Amino acid sequence: MLLIHANYLDEDFRLVQGDIEIEDGKILRVGKDLPRKEEDLAVDCAGSYTVVPGFVDVHIHGCAGADTCDATREALEAMAAFLLAHGVTSFCPTTMTTSRETIQAALLAAKDMMDHPMEGGARVVGVNMEGPFIAKERKGAQKEEDILPPDFPLFQRFYEKSGGIVRLVDLAPEQPGGLDFVEKASQLCTVSIAHTTADYDQAKAAFDKGVTHATHLFNAMSGLHHRKPGVVGAVFDDSRVRGELICDGFHIHPAVLRAAFRLLGDRALIVSDSMRANGMPEGEAFDLGGQMVTVHHGKELLPDGTIAGSVTNLHQEIKNLVSFGVPFEQAVKAATLLPARAIGLDGEIGSIAPGKRADLVVLDENLDIAAVYH
């Protein structure tokens, strides 16, 4: 199969024109006027279309009425189908702070999806464990009674029983045993600072031990002050660490998003952090890790008004960022290659290059999705 006369983002995320040849689900060649046989299917992408890599969401709890912590294949299939329709071709189902039994069951359900992928859905490429090793003071929408101190032996059991599918684990490194956890867990997967009371110095100590990621930067952590830089300042200051950004316009002000993308560059990645209410009618109440949330004017809220995740998706966030003034190429890269890099899969997915999976999204002149190849 060939996509011909395509405007596409090349592996350096420059907009170029040419053909993309696909064979057996992988990109075989890219370039201008590629030779083709008569029997080859050719899709003409000439005009105002732009081909970009499939989106990669490494932090998503749920959507379409389903949640990772439902711990069933059916829930993950509902999520995968919804995500693919919105251009997400790879994702990490994300657990919350809940019981050990639920976390283990969720990991096993994700493993089943990886071993036996569904047709017509986004691909599960690992799991993100957000909790239970977080700070109660910064729990956000996480359930307090299930919060645990950092416990590497417990995490190792989760990791091994699930066949090593955990790609990201979050924690508050200032908690007792936190730095030891970071040092050991970082040998297995990406470790992220999250839901934390850490100050600048404590965050930097965690980075020195192996933290390379910050979960939903700005949210559930100490902010940037000119005399107390906090976790946000520590991330800005350290080139080893990347930051997730929820770009729905509610979690972070557009002006701050513009500044963050300028400061972080290739260390900024987009996540949805979406919940089961994503794609469902506003005003309905939904369970979120044992707590009830409702959606009002695009915001998902706990009864006390706390923002509880989002109801957005990476495609909408790209459109948001472009409207906020972030360059299109940078926004797409932050939703594709950079999240793939964060979980160590940038050699397989995340950009349009020979040898990578042929996960492609065709956007029209309004940045709406015209087609998804997966």
PLM feature segments, named:
Residues 99-105, 174-176, 192-197, 246-262, ...:
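Active-site glycine- and acidic-residue-rich loops that bind
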Residues 62-71, 92-102, 220-236:
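Active-site loop-to-helix "anion-binding N-cap" substructures in soluble metabolic enzymes
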Residues 6, 341, 351-374:
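C-terminal cap of metal-dependent C-N hydrolases
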Residues 61, 77-106, 122-135, 162-174, ...:
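Divalent metal-dependent hydrolysis catalytic cores, especially in the metallo-beta-lactamase
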Residues 129, 136-230:
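Divalent metal-binding pocket/active-site signature
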Residues 1-36, 372:
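N-terminal metal-binding scaffold of metallo-dependent hydrolase/deaminase domains
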Residues 181, 202-335, 341-348, 363-368:
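Active-site-adjacent C-terminal substructures of enzyme catalytic domains
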